Amino acid sequence: MPVKGRIIRVAGPLVVAEGMEGIQMYEMVEVGEERLIGEVNRVVGDKAYIQVYESTTGLKPGEPVYGTGSPLSVELGPGLIGRIYDGIQRPLDVIREVTKSIFVRRGVKVDALDRSRKWHFKPNTTLKPGDKVSGGDVLGEVQETSLITHKVLVPPDVHGRLKWLASEGDYTVEDVIAVVEADGKEIELKMYHRWPVRRARPIIEKLEPVEPLITGMRVIDTMFPMAKGGTGAIPGPFGSGKTVTLQSLAKWSAAKVVIYIGCGERGNEMTEVLETFPKLTDPWTGKPMMERTILIANTSNMPVAAREASIYTGITLAEYYRDMGYDVLLVADSTSRWAEALREIAGRLEEMPAEEGYPSYLASRLAEFYARAGRVKVPGRPERLGSVTIVGAVSPPGGDFTEPVTANTKRFIRVFWALDARLAYSRHYPAINWLVSYSAYVETVAKWWHENISPKWLEYRNEAYEILLREDELREIVRLVGTEGLSEKDKLILEIANIIKTGFLQQNAFDPVDAFATPQKQWKQLETIIDFYHAALEAIKRGVTVKEIREKLAPKIRELILARYNVPNDQLEKLDKLKQELLQALQELIEAKAGRASAAT
């Protein structure tokens, strides 16, 4: 029987209730006369400490608290794609219809999935009554959108013999589509099931991420690649372009499903996402972007405690689509706001603060979250591989990467895209600092690049990276003595580094051609730059100066830098032609130099 207690104290998002004998940790409760949704996060005797996911204004001691007997859970079934939810999986469009208001009122109860919509269910023809079924087995399919075929799965905790499976037809998510017999009991399975958000869905084994998650952003794909099933973070101070970079990731990534969590960020940023995503076209399929996207809007003016729920809601939805065998990208903007919510709740609970006031369990919570990423073999028949890639924004105050959230996040991620305010202020976007950023997936994804694009990819990528590092060392010398004190080879390094920075690393997220670069275009650009560098080195050995190269080839070098705008993804022969023209011009310089030298002798 569900527990019923009463409120004795209200402190911001924290409510203390007594008479709660039998309540469990992380049980979902309904607080007050309006039955606000909350979650138990501490139990002392008959007292329960509850974090409430809605505004507690007006709650008073004496009001009832009702236990539900189950943990905070989400509904998993067809109808999730294309929806916009709040942090506790309430669809915002349905709330507006129910309340006839543009504001999210307290205590609103709406279903996460549309109970009236009918879906065309196609049963799995390999399953017959009497067959053994277990968690993860595919019962049938539903065409959720033109991009996503939704596999209806046996819930992870159900095992038994299939007694009955529905025939092909139109059903709502509430209709029973299968009956499983287990331990003498009949379990009715519907098209949806519920799953606790704090509990990771089971897997068979984790696999090494080996395939790159192509994002269309050159600085990421070529310099600091992300793998499908990987973990990454984008830390950066205010105004450095975190949100635009994350939105570009969500727009152009080669993931089958994208889940975008706006966690505690400004409302106008979430509004921008809500306005732009429905109008965008997926570059991989040509279909509307919303046909593969789920948005979770939990802005800074919504209750603080719901930030934590939104992160867990998002990762649970991601795991569900991973279990179908899809590659899922989860983008969280920003994990710092979630950490601040943890800090506030910990303060209300009067826990001993650790560094900068954050709770001592900050690291373990971050670890739990990032550990749910991965490329995995999922349970059930037929055998499937799926992946969840997590990219979290971090907003360190003043851009200080030593603060606790950034420092702890770095322990659990393998890709670190550090945004630099100086680059952003000089209009270099994405403002990813190549001296501070790193990726542990460069070697593992190199095999894919070698097999699909070019066997020289890793060699050329490393050479470009070394040029950038060498340029940073030379910049200090140039500040002291100017460029005249450098050798011709070092002067060439500065010239090529400038081409790499402005013609390759920079990218305009709002330009129709430059916003997304295919792996083939990225390789052609990189190959042209590095081959030009090799030819220029040879020219310098033959006595040609960098000044002569700059003067003779200025128009062609400018053309190379602007190729990111002027060469569409389907016209890469233009880059081949440009490379030949550059190499030919260098050869002419060498011949002219040799001719002058022989004339002088």
Swiss-Prot record:
<dbReference type="InterPro" id="IPR023366">
    <property type="entry name" value="ATP_synth_asu-like_sf"/>
</dbReference>
<keyword id="KW-0375">Hydrogen ion transport</keyword>
<dbReference type="InterPro" id="IPR005726">
    <property type="entry name" value="ATP_synth_asu_arc"/>
</dbReference>
<keyword id="KW-0406">Ion transport</keyword>
<dbReference type="InterPro" id="IPR003593">
    <property type="entry name" value="AAA+_ATPase"/>
</dbReference>
<dbReference type="GO" id="GO:0005524">
    <property type="term" value="F:ATP binding"/>
</dbReference>
<dbReference type="GO" id="GO:0005886">
    <property type="term" value="C:plasma membrane"/>
</dbReference>
<keyword id="KW-0813">Transport</keyword>
<dbReference type="GO" id="GO:0046933">
    <property type="term" value="F:proton-transporting ATP synthase activity, rotational mechanism"/>
</dbReference>
<dbReference type="InterPro" id="IPR020003">
    <property type="entry name" value="ATPase_a/bsu_AS"/>
</dbReference>
<keyword id="KW-0066">ATP synthesis</keyword>
<dbReference type="GO" id="GO:0016887">
    <property type="term" value="F:ATP hydrolysis activity"/>
</dbReference>
<dbReference type="Pfam" id="PF22919">
    <property type="entry name" value="ATP-synt_VA_C"/>
</dbReference>
<dbReference type="InterPro" id="IPR031686">
    <property type="entry name" value="ATP-synth_a_Xtn"/>
</dbReference>
<feature type="binding site">
    <location>
        <begin position="236"/>
        <end position="243"/>
    </location>
    <ligand>
        <name>ATP</name>
    </ligand>
</feature>
<dbReference type="InterPro" id="IPR000194">
    <property type="entry name" value="ATPase_F1/V1/A1_a/bsu_nucl-bd"/>
</dbReference>
<comment type="subunit">
    <text>Has multiple subunits with at least A(3), B(3), C, D, E, F, H, I and proteolipid K(x).</text>
</comment>
<keyword id="KW-1278">Translocase</keyword>
<dbReference type="InterPro" id="IPR004100">
    <property type="entry name" value="ATPase_F1/V1/A1_a/bsu_N"/>
</dbReference>
<keyword id="KW-0547">Nucleotide-binding</keyword>
<dbReference type="GO" id="GO:0042777">
    <property type="term" value="P:proton motive force-driven plasma membrane ATP synthesis"/>
</dbReference>
<dbReference type="InterPro" id="IPR024034">
    <property type="entry name" value="ATPase_F1/V1_b/a_C"/>
</dbReference>
<dbReference type="InterPro" id="IPR036121">
    <property type="entry name" value="ATPase_F1/V1/A1_a/bsu_N_sf"/>
</dbReference>
<keyword id="KW-0472">Membrane</keyword>
<comment type="similarity">
    <text>Belongs to the ATPase alpha/beta chains family.</text>
</comment>
<dbReference type="Pfam" id="PF00006">
    <property type="entry name" value="ATP-synt_ab"/>
</dbReference>
<dbReference type="Pfam" id="PF02874">
    <property type="entry name" value="ATP-synt_ab_N"/>
</dbReference>
<protein>
    <recommendedName>
        <fullName>A-type ATP synthase subunit A</fullName>
        <ecNumber>7.1.2.2</ecNumber>
    </recommendedName>
</protein>
<dbReference type="InterPro" id="IPR055190">
    <property type="entry name" value="ATP-synt_VA_C"/>
</dbReference>
<dbReference type="InterPro" id="IPR027417">
    <property type="entry name" value="P-loop_NTPase"/>
</dbReference>
<keyword id="KW-1003">Cell membrane</keyword>
<keyword id="KW-0067">ATP-binding</keyword>
<comment type="function">
    <text>Component of the A-type ATP synthase that produces ATP from ADP in the presence of a proton gradient across the membrane. The A chain is the catalytic subunit.</text>
</comment>
<dbReference type="InterPro" id="IPR022878">
    <property type="entry name" value="V-ATPase_asu"/>
</dbReference>
<dbReference type="Pfam" id="PF16886">
    <property type="entry name" value="ATP-synt_ab_Xtn"/>
</dbReference>
<dbReference type="GO" id="GO:0046961">
    <property type="term" value="F:proton-transporting ATPase activity, rotational mechanism"/>
</dbReference>
<dbReference type="GO" id="GO:0033178">
    <property type="term" value="C:proton-transporting two-sector ATPase complex, catalytic domain"/>
</dbReference>
